[in-house]
Structure formats: C-alpha cells, structure tokens
Amino acid sequence: MKRVDRNLTKEILFGGLRWYKKIYWILQHTAKKRDLKTVSPQVRAALILGTYQIFYMDRIPDRAAVNESVEYVRFKSEAGAVPFVNGILRQIARRAEYFTKPDKKNKPVEYLALQYSHPDWLVKRWLDRFKFERMETMLEANNQPPPVFIRVNGAKTTPMDLQESLLRDEQTHSEKGNLKGCLILKKHPDMSPEGLFARGFYTIQDQASQLISYLVNLQPEATIVDAAAGPGGKLTHMCEMGQGKIKLIAVEKSGPQMERARQTATRLGHDTNIEWVFSDFMDYTPKDKVDRVLLDAPCTGLGVLRRHPEGKWQKAESGIKELAEQQKKLIEHALKMLKPGGEMIYSVCSFETDETESQMRWVKSTYGDQVEVVSPVSRLPDYFKRYVTRENVLMIYAGNQDDMDGFGAFIIRWKGAP
C-alpha cells in the first residue's frame, strides 16, 4: 500500500472511532425501525466509515464514499445488505444533520457526549471538574488528529539543518516547537529505509512527553532507572541530554517494547551506557541504590485519546481506581531504590486527579518527613512553567494552547528514614 493510501486509510479508521457515538446515533435515526445491532459487523463498519467520510471528509465526494462502502459490503459477501447500505448512506448524503439533539442547558452531559462523541461517564466525570466551555475545547481536541511532533537528534544535526534537509530531501515543511530541539511536521514523516527518520536524524515524540526528561536531574555520573523503557522515547532523550555522562538502566517487561527501545537507541546512536533489564519493574531490584527512577506508570491514557480513540469505548470508570492502586505499589517500589537525596520522577499520560495530584498527596501523607516534593518549575524551560500547579504537579490538559498530549508528572526527593 502506498504511503498516501495508508495515511488515508488510517484517517478514515481513526475518524470512525473518534466519532463513533455520534455516527451511530445518526445511523440509527436514519435506519429508524432497523436496529443496527442486528446487522453484521462488516455491514455496521461500512455504515460507520461511510458516514464518517460523508460528514467529516470534504475531500472525498459523497458519491465516492457511498460507492466504496457498498463495494466493501459486496466484497465481504454481504450482497443481500447492499441495498440497505446504499439506501442508508444515500439518505445521509442528501440530508444535513437535522435530528433533534439533547438540550444543551438541561441535559449538558447527554449533549456533550453526543455532540463530541464521548462516553457519558467520562463527560460527567470531567464536567464535575471543568466548565462547559472548557469541556467543549477538550472534547473537540480529542477528536482531532494530533500534530506530528519530532525530537531532533542533537548528536547528528541541528533543528535548522534538519528543517532544511526535510524540505530538500522529503518535501516536508516543518516549524519549530516551543521546546528546544522540537519540530512540528506538516505531514506524515517518510518512514522509508533511506529517509531521515531511519537514518537517526530525529524521532517522533510528543512535546509533552519530551518535557518529562527535563524533570530528571541528569547530573554527571548519576545512575537512572527507567522503569518502563519501551518504546524508548524518554530513554533516548535522557541519553542525549546526559551526553554520555550518566548510566541508564532500562527496565521493560514486554519483549516487543524492549526490542523497540533497543532499535530506537541504536537508530539514534544512543545505545551506549544503557544496561538492559528484561523484567517486570516490580520484580526488579538494582544491586545498589540509584540516583533517579523515572516511573512512567501504567495509566488510563485519558490524556492521549486523540491518538487512541478506541480507548474512549474500551475503558470504564471503575478502571481508574484500579490503576491508581497499581500505581501506588509501583511508587512504593521505586522509592525503595533511591539513595538519600535521590529522586523519583512520576509521569502518566493522563490528567485524572486520581492518577496525578492525589498520588502526590498520598506519597506525602504516607512518607511524611522521609520525602520532599520538588517543584517542576525548577527544571522546566521558562515557557512551560505555566503548566505547573500550585501543588507542584505538571498538569497538561487536553485542548491546551500548545496542542500537546495530556500529561501529569511530579518529582519526589527521597530524604531517607528519619
């Protein structure tokens, strides 16, 4: 499949997932008495993806969206459903979005959940924290494809030189991000073996994720444990920032993720001074106490729904509490590894209170004088200090002004037993 076809296919599939709830609502109103749950998954998929193209992709003519969806159904040996699919999609193509929606004022949860295609439980949860207007911004942001942030490999090039190379060699325009060494590509990168990516001139990493390495105080001779090293973004960023003067212990329990991290490190030329440990973090204990632990903890991923739209429909509210308990165990294990004066940097791709601020408060209440909260303000570039809360937690919400992923992070210094 050509790159342009692959990108278009991904856009349609992800779009169908992002707008699933609203599309299903439109389809069910159009189908009227026919319950869509009774049709085959193939027919349902054709209807959803066809409707997405009609409503959200201006560059695809409605006629083409209808015809391709019908041919897909025919190809999947669902010939009997062809008239049904053809009829439904043609009705949708002829009409504007005219069905009566829930009232915005009296039923804000139902309105937002439908208008922006999010599960009701998540909208209700967030509406308890955020104002209606901000909610609209956040939910809309979750439905937009993320920008392509890249991290320039300073060992091989400079941002300016890479911008010139991208334009000259790959006809890719880019602009500078607000973080040193960060660029934003204007189209999908060239992933071919001879491309600049494959040759290690840059790696793909959201700007919010790049910020986390700034929180790790990378002093010379420091030993740092990366508790979940795959796929290698933060690991290799620390390698570059440490300039070969730090020792990294990369812990990863997933074989494929470990391999990805190794490949990323090799591709970027940052594969020295790394000790690779194939293990669950909870089963790993270093020989000696360490200076830093970067705990990029398992989380709900509610800050990266624009990257993983299927997550909206796969997650349940009960899972937040369960993950929070798991995170506490990982935090306890991480703190045991630290020398006096050592630091744990905790991060998640979520802005849920249970996974961020509440975790920091729990650490303080549990360990008292044995720990100290270090403000991220002391580590971050000036521009990004605006994202630090009064409680000294880095909190990046969906729909932020810099179009970054949602993230949360804090720093705990281990003072030792009193």
Residue ranges and their predicted role:
Residues 1-418:
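S-adenosylmethionine
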